[in-house]
């Protein structure tokens, strides 16, 4: 067929290829490796109870923040444990100036998925054989929990909605503090080091706040 015997891909693609029969079931060859991995990455290479690959890495989300800006606003990011506390912090940071925001909303679909999952959402369901897919974005409790929270921040003008993600201006915001924090994967420090080097020493990381 011209396809490689072994290929690297993102976890989300495993079901897409497995449903079509494009991946080889290697369950019998990998059962001994289960305890080597944490549950999340191990589950990510499975579909319908079968294993189709081995995890290579994991990018757990974390709360990255500009300590200099948070200190200026009188906010201790380490004490932000809930989304309500994050909302309160957003108001204090925006009070520093009209161009200061706790974070930006770039419209990233992956961010939406991650945050709704954090709230316990399961809006996408598949049948055991993968032949049927159910999408429930309007009634899922976790989706509503996140969208209500995020919409409140948007309605009150507490998020930067004008700066495109991964743009030069976006990284500039990381440097000058006008974009003061990120909920993102643990891989972001390398990006900050390369594209926002002038902000070195200002950024810290802590655990993600949750809905309650």
Give the ranges of each region predicted by the language model:
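A ligand-binding cleft/hinge motif common to bilobed small-molecule-binding domains
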Residues: 14-18, 185-200
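Extracytoplasmic "Venus flytrap"/periplasmic binding protein-like
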Residues: 1-37, 72-74, 81, 172-173, ...
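Short beta-strand-to-loop elements that line the ligand-binding cleft
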Residues: 77-83, 159-167
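Beta->alpha turn/N-cap motifs
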Residues: 9-13, 167, 184-189, 208
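Glycine-centered hinge/linker elements that transmit conformational signals in sensory
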Residues: 88-92, 132-163
């Amino acid at each position: 067929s011209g396809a490689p015997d072994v290929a690297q891909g993102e976890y989300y693609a495993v079901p897409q290829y497995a449903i079509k029969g494009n991946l080889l079931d290697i369950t019998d060859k990998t059962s001994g490796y289960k305890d080597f991995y944490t549950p999340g990455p191990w589950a990510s290479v499975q579909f319908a109870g079968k294993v189709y690959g081995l995890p290579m890495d994991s990018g757990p989300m974390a709360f990255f923040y500009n300590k200099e800006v948070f200190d200026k606003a009188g906010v201790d990011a380490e004490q932000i444990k809930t989304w309500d506390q994050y909302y309160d912090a957003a108001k204090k940071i925006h009070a520093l100036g009209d161009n200061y925001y706790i974070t930006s909303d770039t419209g990233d679909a992956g961010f939406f998925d991650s945050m709704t999952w954090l709230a316990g959402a399961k809006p996408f369901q598949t049948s055991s054989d993968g032949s049927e897919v159910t999408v429930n974005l309007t009634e899922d409790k976790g989706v509503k929990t996140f969208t209500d929270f995020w919409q409140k921040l948007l309605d009150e003008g507490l998020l930067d909605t004008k700066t495109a993600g991964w743009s030069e201006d976006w990284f500039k915001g990381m440097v000058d503090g006008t974009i003061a924090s990120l909920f993102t994967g643990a891989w972001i420090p390398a990006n900050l080091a390369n594209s926002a080097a002038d902000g070195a020493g200002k950024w810290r990381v802590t655990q993600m706040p949750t809905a309650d």
